[in-house]
Amino acid sequence: MSNWIKYRYGIIACLVMLFCLGLRIPREQKNQSVKARALMQAEQFSRRCDTLRLAADAFKFGKINQIDLQSELLAARQAYKRIEYLWEYLYPAFAEEHLNGAPLLHIERHDTRPFVIPPEGLQVLDEMVFADNAKEESAQILILAQKLSTSAKKLLAGFRGRSLSTIEIREAQRMELIRIFTLGLTGFDTPGSGNALAEAQAAMAELAVVDELLQEKLRLTQELRSRQLFDGALQYLGSNRDFDSFDRLHFLRGYLDPLYAQLLELSPVGSQSQLQSSWRPESKSLFSDDFLDPYFFAELKAAEDGEKVRALGKRLFYDPSLSASGEMSCGSCHQANQAFSDGQATSTSRIQGRSLSRNAPTLLNAVYADRYFYDLRAFTLEQQAEHVIFNTEEFNSAYEEILAKLSHNEQYRVSFETAFPKQGLNRENLSKALASYVLSLRSFDSPFDQYARGEREDIDPLVKEGFNLFMGKAACGTCHFAPIFSGLVPPFYVKNESEILGVPQTPFALQKSLDADLGRYANGIYSEQADIYQRSFKTTTVRNVAETAPYFHNGSFRSLENVIDFYDIGGGSGYRLDVYNQTLPSDPLGLTEREKQALIAFMKALSDNPFATIDK
């Protein structure tokens, strides 16, 4: 590394340590408004992007080496972390598409046709600039750096005239805490450099400055707990820089979650959030049962729901008369004592001697998704029921037939009129009643949840170790996002990811082959018939996973040990299967036997099925 780079890194390290030592912000800096400071940071980021563009050009023509280019990228990323909390809050779609989205191909829809769009932004550059073949990709790196520079200028121009309210700033701060924990500390955000902890520190330091500016603005002169928590968080991040050994659980309980609650207390009273998100700003913990709004994902609204609607939905859920044969109900494949799965590799068909093509996933916390089924073919809970009703191997029925049956049942007629006084029995209300019951199947009171919220003093050390592995070295948390531990993407929690793992048809066979199920590619949605979705399946929750064996869409893995071994070798690629579009990293994780057992201990600590002895 050249001397000027070492010198600059020394200056940056000293500045960061000033934060870590809890030194107070100078009075003249306190007098700046948050907007003025944010504008300063945005301008700094734009300048850094210009410098990165010049460095990428120099790298392409051999004027600087890869280490110099990496240094410039890290500086640009550090600058972004100081404006990230606001820009990703105010402009989430633009930020995801152009500034810091995941380095994965995605589609844009033109009419009904899918167009595959390559990713751009800081994460893609992080992956490419730190790759062994960076020189071979120098032309593409330059193109991406040029695009990033242009995007930064565009957003800066729009941001100049944007006013900020205190509620927006506080929500942006709290959402950044979620982002730091779920995307930053997990390494999701830094796929090539692994510079996760330093970037988390930069983002946290900026939140601390903004907090003091807000306190000055509101004339809060008393020593607030938020200052102490920020100081402690920065010190901890500064003194614990090893990614694999970083104690994320201690950081969550000791600093981040208390800060999340404290900043809520400092938020303006009575202010109404304008966010289009399932995140509930009034929640006090990342692991509280009100962290997300389940009604965000359903056509049924909270004002329509109630005990009578839920009771009606429960009765319908367990009523076999909804199926044409009168022998199958929703509860046939989703059994309460097995966390609403059925324990079979693939569920039993209504046709004797046959099975359905896929495993029955749990319905506990299933509401927290914008897409349903393994292939994501349904967009709401209500649509999910519709697919089961029409499926010839399941209910093999139709709404008209079901409504006719129910209309001849006096108890059902009365129940619908009581639950839905304005319209009574109809197709829409039938779907809403079923959705109400499924929506009620929520569980956030596992031993781990209680410990994370500080409601219990201790938990098995193996569980702690497993959580830190899950969110760190094992990289589970980069696809199974906290706190749902599914593919519901933080911090807005409005859309689900699907992944291509290369799941084999029979993992224990000597000659293994890929499962033939095409997944999302064949979900009947024409605009998703793209190669990037071949054999792509929804990332389901690992909550209550101890009760839902066997695993994956085809139920081919019998135990959690089998599942972890599969991930440890790098998925289907680790079996030397031809998975040309695998999204799971193919590099082995190198987990020890103890680490594997720790992961299992953590996942078992997520067990919480209050409906196990349900009264039908």
Residue ranges and their predicted role:
Residues Y9-Q29, G232-V309, N396, E400, ...:
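Post-cleavage N-terminal segment of exported redox proteins
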Residues D68-S71, A75, N429-S436, A598:
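Amphipathic alpha-helical interaction segments
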Residues N544, Y551, S556-P610:
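Extracellular low-complexity, Gly/Ser/Thr-rich intrinsically disordered linkers
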